A protein has these predicted regions:
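WD40 beta-propeller blade core
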Residues: 55, 92, 135-137, 177-178, ...
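Repeated scaffold domains used in trafficking and secretory/extracellular systems
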Residues: 33-39, 67-74, 112-119, 155-165, ...
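Bacterial Sec-dependent N-terminal signal peptides
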Residues: 1-26
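Surface loop/turn motifs at the tips and blade-to-blade linkers of beta-strand repeat domains
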Residues: 27-32, 61-66, 105-111, 149-154, ...
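Short coil/turn segments that connect the beta-strands within blades of beta-propeller domains
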Residues: 43-44, 78-79, 123-124, 165-166, ...
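Beta-strand-rich domains and repeat architectures in extracellular enzymes and scaffolds
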Residues: 26-51
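Short loop/turn segments immediately following the C-termini of beta-strands
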Residues: 51, 86, 123, 131, ...
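Short loop/turn segments that connect beta-strands within beta-propeller blades
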Residues: 58, 95-99, 140-143, 180-184, ...
Length: 219
């Protein structure tokens, strides 16, 4: 345990030594035990989950109890937030004020899709993982069609996937993948450390397991 703690201290001290970190006090927001802070945008706006409602500060919220619990919220583009409800295979796109722009109900598609995760692609596209055939696909949520010839097969059970627009990073229990805009795998590395989560720091990748944090340079 002491060795793991030392690793984290050295890791973060290395970041602090090369990057000026400034902490600013934010305005107080009234919360209770049911609030879960899930994100903060570049303007300092805070996003919470409260009793399965998505809230932005104290003024804006989105809720649709008919879709069950919120599985994931993708904040990469704050003007097109993606709210994923896996139980009902439904994606809801929200604007900056949490008003609904559109929604996708994959259960109503002509083919059978078992979407278990989503991540932003570009302006009107998202990446989805279809468990029915273990493939990464790209979907145009405005025209509600899949992009032809983008169906990337991955090996292992999906753990996490995140995009920084330029690339999609996919983590399974076997491998870490880096996938380009066209769905081509350009990087594949064994998941030997048992990573459970992908994060971004500037242009680099952070990987974490249950006790350690790793820094992967994105060259």
């Amino acid at each position: 345990m002491r060795a793991q703690l030392l690793f984290l201290i050295v890791f973060f001290n290395s970041f602090l030594a090369h990057n000026q970190i400034i902490l600013n006090k934010i305005e107080s927001i009234k919360t209770n035990d049911s609030y879960e802070l899930i994100s903060a945008d570049s303007l300092g706006e805070l996003f919470f989950l409260e009793d399965n409602n998505l809230r932005k500060g104290e003024d804006y919220f989105f809720s649709d109890s008919s879709l069950g619990p919120i599985t994931k919220v993708d904040f990469y583009n704050n003007f097109k937030l993606k709210v994923w409800y896996q139980d009902f295979n439904t994606l809801v796109i929200l604007d900056n004020y949490l008003n609904e722009i559109t929604r996708v109900q994959f259960n109503k598609a002509s083919s059978v899709f078992e979407i278990s995760d989503i991540s932003s692609a570009n302006e009107n596209d998202i990446w989805v993982y279809d468990e029915s055939n273990m493939r990464i696909k790209k979907f145009d949520f405005f025209n509600q069609v899949f992009t032809e010839n983008v169906h990337t097969l991955i090996d292992g059970n999906l753990i996490d996937m995140k995009s920084n627009y330029n690339y999609l990073w996919v983590l399974t229990d076997k491998y870490l993948y880096k996938i380009n805009y066209n769905g081509l795998i350009i990087f594949k590395k064994e998941n030997k450390i048992g990573s459970k989560k992908i994060g971004f720091y500037k242009n680099d990748i952070l990987l974490s397991n249950e006790s350690e944090l790793y820094h992967l340079e994105n060259n």
